[in-house]
Amino acid sequence: MAECPTDLINEMFLRLRATTLKKCRVLSKPCFSLIDSPEKRVIERSDSPPPPLGFNNHLLPLANAYDDDDEEEGNELKKSQARRNGVAKGEGNGNKVNGEAQEEVDDEEDDDDDASKGRGKHSRHVEVRRDCPYLDTVNRQVIIIDQFLMLRVPLATMRKRMRTGGRKAKAMEKYLKKVLKKSG
């Protein structure tokens, strides 16, 4: 019987839980020393990649977790708060009692501007909810292309039928509900 390299054996032992390994009866003393050394286990565990998400979402790069309107509202709120802080410190009526308040506000705005110049709209990170992969963290629905591919009715035909209205539109709506029930 050929012997395995000790490095390979040590690596296998390091990947198992210490409690599991201590239950084993046939282990040499060097293996127990590896099990009991916490720094060795921490080094090995930190090198391993994070676990996969468990689902494959092709539209994830297209999703946007933040709205531009929300950012604009946030900037307006900061500016109004800065104005209120300035009035509270005695900057009202054109008299500046303390010049530090205005400088602090200017510094904060400069920092925000520098940070926003470095990031583009496309570099925003979208967090995916693990409990429901079809929703992002803002609870917006991420459209799944596969559902539309399964319909077998070209989108142009569907649009045409919906525009004509009447029985055709109702029939199309009924058909879509039936197909979506089967797929979901």
Curated annotation (Swiss-Prot):
Report residue spans for region: Disordered: 68-126
Q: Where is the composition biased (Acidic residues)?
A: 101-114
Biased composition annotated in UniProt, kind: Low complexity: 85-100
Q: Which domain of life is it from?
A: Eukaryota
- The F-box domain extends over 1-46
Can you say what this protein is called?
Answer: Putative F-box protein At4g22420
Organism (species) = Arabidopsis thaliana
